[in-house]
Amino acid sequence: MDSRVYIIKFDNWGFMVNLMNKIQILRKISQTLFFVRALIVTGFYLSIVGFIKRFIIGDRILATIITKIIAIVLAFIAGRVFCGWMCPFGFLFNLVYELRVKLFKLKKLPTVDEKIHNKLIYFKYVVLILVVLAYLSGVKISGYTLAYLLLALFLVLGFIYPMFFCRYVCPVGSLLSIFARFSIFKLKLDENKCVGCRLCERKCPMQIKITEKIDQMECIRCFECMSVCKKGALSFSAFTKNTKKE
Ligand code: SF4
Ligand code: SF4
C-alpha cells in the first residue's frame, strides 16, 4: 500500500490551476484578516520592534500567546506557514514586491547576488541572538519614530528585493525556520516531471534554488512556485523525498 500522504499533488493541469488559484485567494484572505487583526490588537501601531519583542520575548496578551503557539505548531507540521499566511509584516512586504512586479511588468523577481544571498540568510539568526541578549541584559528599544523608520526602510528594501526583511533580518522567521527544519510536510520536486524551465525560481520571493535543493527552512509556503509550474513537478507532502530522475 502506498503510505505517502499528499495534501497538494496534481496530475491534471486544469484542476491544478484551479486549485492553486483558490489557494492563492485563500492566502490573500488569510493575510488580510491577520493584518487587520494586528491593526486592531496594536491600536494601529505596527511596530517591527514591538512585533519581535512580543513574539520572541513574549507578553501576557492572550491573542499573542495563542498566535505564537499556532505559529510554532504549524512550523513543526508544515514549515513557515506563519510567514506566508499570517504575519502582518509579511503581508506588507508581499504587497510592495507585488507592486514592483506590476509597475515594472517584471517576468522574474529581482535577486540578490547568489554568494551574498547565501551568506545574508544567516544574518537573521544573529538578530535572533542579539534580541535575546538585549532582553537578558535589560536593554529596552522602543519609540514611534524608530518603529516607523524601520518599517519604511524595510518597505523600501522589500520593494527592491522581495521579502528582504523576511529573508535576512526577521528573528521570528529565524526562530520558525529552526522548527521548519523538522516539519512533517515539505515542498518536494519530482525530477522526472521537471523540465528545468525554472519558472518556479523566477517567482520564488525567497530566492530558493528550487530545482537544485529546496531549502525548507527558508520556504514561507506561499506556493507561488506550485502556481506557475506547468508540469505539476512540485508537491507539498509528508513522508516522501524529492523524486530523483530515473
Ligand atoms: S516550474 Fe516546474 S518544470 Fe519548471 S523548473 Fe520549476 S519545477 Fe521544474
Ligand atoms: S519555494 Fe515555493 S512555497 Fe517556498 S517560498 Fe519559494 S515560491 Fe514560496
From Swiss-Prot:
It holds the Pfam family Fer4_5. It is found in: Cell membrane. It is a multi-pass membrane protein. It comes from the Archaea. One of its GO terms (cellular component) is plasma membrane. Its main location: membrane. The chain crosses the membrane at residues 32-52, 69-89, 121-141, 146-166. One of its GO terms (molecular function) is metal ion binding. Residues 185-213, 210-239 form the 4Fe-4S ferredoxin-type domain. Keywords: 4Fe-4S, Cell membrane, Electron transport, Iron, Iron-sulfur, Membrane, Metal-binding, Repeat, Transmembrane, Transmembrane helix, Transport. [4Fe-4S] cluster 2 binds at residues 204, 219, 222, 225. [4Fe-4S] cluster 1 binds at residues 194, 197, 200, 229. This is Uncharacterized protein MJ0749. It comes from Methanocaldococcus jannaschii (strain ATCC 43067 / DSM 2661 / JAL-1 / JCM 10045 / NBRC 100440).
